[in-house]
């Protein structure tokens, strides 16, 4: 009977040890003690219950302790992990900042990390500035010649403005705007080609890094190419547009003239019809005048002679006009 009880106690002890070691990473606890980091068994059990991987927290804490970062504590690391942060990257950033002499607190690094920024890359950029290449920017000088410029912007991360500061896209856009303004204010494209550093000096003096997460160290013009003669092309387009407008106006006047001509022809036909209609009334009027005695027979024949004389003169005039036209031909 005592043997059975002893066997049951052994099984219970083994079960307890299995559960205990599943909650407590003994090797990790020993590593922490060997590194001089005081960790309680209850802290490890609490991390297991809160579903926080002890390896990530303890290894980061050991790393911070060895680097002399006394402000980094177990509670801060665990809280940052539970907030969704990258504990290992924050500790590495703090170590890099300490070695480079950059003032950076754990709270600031954690805030940068939670804001979605790569805090370790930011610290590295503070030490080793990054070069950003802008796309080709096209602008037109006052003489109408297009220039295409490409710049290299050297920037250093500004730790204080990483949270809430604008990113690389803003720097590229502002530099492009400055290039366009500088080229556009040049009297001739030759001025820019002869002195391309005037672009970088003008753009750098504008303080384009205001409100961004970076500090502009330098702006260098990598390449300047001559593009199209935009001024000449615009003048050609304007001349072509003016010509089309003039053609349209001339066509409109021609159409009005044709319409007026047709209108006058119709009016002439109408007047001719009225004349013919009036001429038909002349013999009737003459006959009525003869019957009523208003004119005599001699008057009638005198009128006939005048009409015949007029017709003869018109015929002679038309014949003379035809002969004159024949001589000219």
UniProtKB/Swiss-Prot annotation:
- Lineage, top-rank taxon, reads Bacteria
Q: State the annotated membrane topology for this chain.
A: Single-pass membrane protein
Any keyword Transmembrane helix?
A: yes
Keywords from the named record: Cell membrane, Membrane, Transmembrane, Transmembrane helix
Q: Does the keyword Transmembrane apply?
A: yes
Q: Which sequence ranges are marked TM in the entry? A: 4-24
Subunit structure, as described in the record: Homooligomerizes.
Q: Which family does it belong to?
A: Belongs to the flotillin-like FloA family.
Q: Output this protein's name.
A: Flotillin-like protein FloA
